[in-house]
Amino acid sequence: MIRFLIPILLFCSPALSLGAAERPPQIHLAGDSTMANYKLENPQRGWGMALGAFFADPAMVHNHAISGRSTKTFVRDGHWGRLLAELQAGDFVIIQFGHNDEKVNLPKTGTDVATEFPDNLRRFVREVRAKQTVPLLATPVARRKFDRDGKLVPTHGAYPDAIRAVARELDVPLLDLERDTSAWLREEGVEASKKFFVGVTPVGKPPTAPAAPDNTHFLEPGAQRVAGLAAQEIRALNLPLARWLK
């Protein structure tokens, strides 16, 4: 009798079902500088660097995000092709662009919000699904920009709404980080929010001339906070990936 109970117990035990025999899904990140990896001597952090800490196995996260990239240049420079080549069935891909797509004054980088940008997102979704992997779209994180009255100013134009529209159209899970980070910055306020951003903190070599404060890129506490918001979204969406969250 015992020999028949053993396989049943093995099947029913959550701890054993997540054992070494099961390959955890891998999470691949496609995005820009707000998500990218940086050398540890650089105080700047992308939120993708902090995401692994929210999962049972930090090595699940593979960060392909590259500074300065848009949906156009991420493909053109070969990063998208390399990401696709690493995918295995059951993996997840989180796609976050917008910061550089909105630079339409730079034709080699920017994309039109009504045509090329959503078309590129559709391509990403289609090609990820063709690999039997799961795409997640993410809206771009908010910049720390407040007006004189202390009101947070949106800076991404129509790009977040374009992402939301593609997510609805193609039934793609959406991590609405523009909404979430905007709410977070409003809650922190003008002064308290400074500690999360590079601001005037030196990054790399000292500039030859004073630079404008950087209210786009994160220090470690900011990256950790955004990664936590992404993890909350994954849990709230009840995605299969959520079972691997701590």
Q: Where are each of the predicted segments found?
A:
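Bacterial N-terminal signal peptides
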Residues: F4-A15
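Generic detector of short, well-ordered, non-transmembrane alpha-helical segments enriched
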Residues: A15-L16, L219
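Serine-esterase "nucleophile elbow" of acetyl-processing enzymes
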Residues: L18-I66, G81-V93
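Alpha-helical cap/lid subdomain in secreted, periplasmic
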Residues: E22, G78-K246
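Short, histidine-centered active-site or binding-site loop motifs used for metal coordination
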Residues: G31-S33, G68, D101, V141-A142
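Acidic/histidine-rich helix-loop elements
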Residues: A36-R45, A65-F74, K103-V113
